[in-house]
């Protein structure tokens, strides 16, 4: 794990770089391979994250579940082994951005879920990339403000 890494700001940035490399492609694979059950699960988790965000309640676990469901829907045997890296980064991102990406998270999660449901790999890839870029931009702004 990443428990012993002292520089949390560097860790957040590095995890985000790795997620930007991996997750858009994972979303694309999920759009190609997701079956009806996968799509139901992804859509339900998207709804749950949105509901929690709108109530200003902790959405971290459901957010983790959403990204994990997408990874499993890729049907790639290696991807689930990457999920712990993605999962460990989400609480750090939520903590770092302090809920400032409420609308962006709702919109991009919905776009990712819709693209996967439509079996549109390019749209899913773009939506996931946009989701992560919003996070990166917000984290960079927070880093700048704290310097």
Q: How would you label these PLM feature ranges?
A:
Residues 1-21, 28, 145-147:
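Short linear motifs at protein or domain termini
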Residues 15-95, 105-113, 123-136:
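Conserved amphipathic alpha-helical segments that form helical-bundle/coiled-coil interaction surfaces
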Residues 137-147:
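Generic C-terminal helix-cap and adjacent flexible tail
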């Amino acid at each position: 794990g990443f428990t012993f890494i002292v520089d949390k700001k560097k860790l957040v940035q590095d995890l985000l770089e790795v997620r930007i490399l991996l997750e858009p492609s994972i979303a694309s694979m999920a759009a190609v391979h997701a079956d009806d059950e996968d799509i139901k699960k992804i859509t339900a988790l998207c709804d749950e994250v949105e509901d929690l965000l709108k109530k200003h309640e902790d959405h971290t676990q459901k957010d983790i579940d959403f990204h994990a469901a997408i990874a499993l829907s890729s049907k790639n045997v290696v991807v689930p082994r990457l999920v712990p890296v993605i999962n460990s980064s989400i609480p750090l991102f939520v903590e770092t951005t302090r809920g400032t990406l409420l609308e962006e998270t709702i919109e991009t999660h919905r776009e990712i879920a819709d693209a996967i449901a439509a079996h549109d790999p390019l749209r899913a890839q773009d939506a996931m990339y946009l989701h992560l870029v919003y996070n990166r931009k917000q984290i960079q702004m927070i880093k700048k403000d704290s310097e």
